[in-house]
Amino acid sequence: MDPEHCAPFRVGPAPGPYVASGDEPPGPQGTPAAAPHLHPAPPRGPRLTRFPACGPLEPYLPEPAKPPAKYLQDLGPGPALNGGHFYEGPAEAEEKTSKAASFPQLPLDCRGGPRDGPSNLQGSPGPCLASLHLPLSPGLPDSMELAKNKSKKRRNRTTFSTFQLEELEKVFQKTHYPDVYAREQLALRTDLTEARVQVWFQNRRAKWRKRERYGKIQEGRNPFTAAYDISVLPRTDSHPQLQNSLWASPGSGSPGGPCLVSPEGIPSPCMSPYSHPHGSVAGFMGVPAPSAAHPGIYSIHGFPPTLGGHSFEPSSDGDYKSPSLVSLRVKPKEPPGLLNWTT
């Protein structure tokens, strides 16, 4: 292998071969030169020569990527460009940007240039962040408070006098919807504005509709309560003689006891015209059956007081204490046909 074609260019003081012993060629000041690169070096020296021999080639291992912050810290002030630094200081950057923009810039301690890196942002917020909480414009809080006060403000309620209410009620009795001319005339008489009069009529119409609905509900309830009110029904307490004379003790065992009138005045089932073959208890006892019962009994069911020409009226002479009832009480177990039915 030809050593003349193995290595790229190198920088040396003078052309001259040297022994390929793995040692570095001496530099210009007698110090060892830099390690040979696999890529072409920039032309810095006056002479360019080739390495007469090549050592063992090693694979190129790229360095791991660094974050921008570390890269900027390692870079330092930066390369020179036309006699000045490429990275500007914070003061120069602020001066240039303030000329380009019309709005105020942030304080200097809030931002750092590329030379400082983002290390300033890792510390305490400092006074610069506190300045961000200041209002953008001094008049903004005042306008917000003014709008808040307007929303809280309520209009004053109009207090009408007695004369004003009388005049308004007179017109309302005539018409519920007065026209503009009537409202203006009423406003002149009552010393009010037309808008106040219009609002009063709106509220008065709403109150009137509410009362109408409530009145209809009450009218619908009154006939029902009047027709079915138990307190106004007639009571049979006005006939104590009938109850005392026809009431039998429960322990007497009389067959006619359950069929007689109860103390509450409500007839038992056997009092109906169809519960006995003789038609009624009175007919069974020999008393002529009345054509109609007492009106107090049938008034609960809505029947008319009289169904015929005669009405049942108990006598005060004690006619029901006849020998037939006495015989029934004395001989309850004897058949009815053997009893003496004398009146």
Swiss-Prot record:
It comes from the Eukaryota. PROSITE patterns: HOMEOBOX_1, HOMEOBOX_2. GO terms for molecular function: DNA-binding transcription factor activity, RNA polymerase II-specific; RNA polymerase II transcription regulatory region sequence-specific DNA binding; sequence-specific double-stranded DNA binding. Pfam families: Homeodomain (PF00046). One of its GO terms (cellular component) is nucleus. CDD domains: homeodomain (cd00086). Residues 153-212 bind DNA. Transcriptional regulator with a possible role in patterning of mesoderm during development. This is Homeobox protein aristaless-like 3. It comes from Homo sapiens (Human). The lineage of its organism: Eukaryota, Metazoa, Chordata, Craniata, Vertebrata. The gene is ALX3.
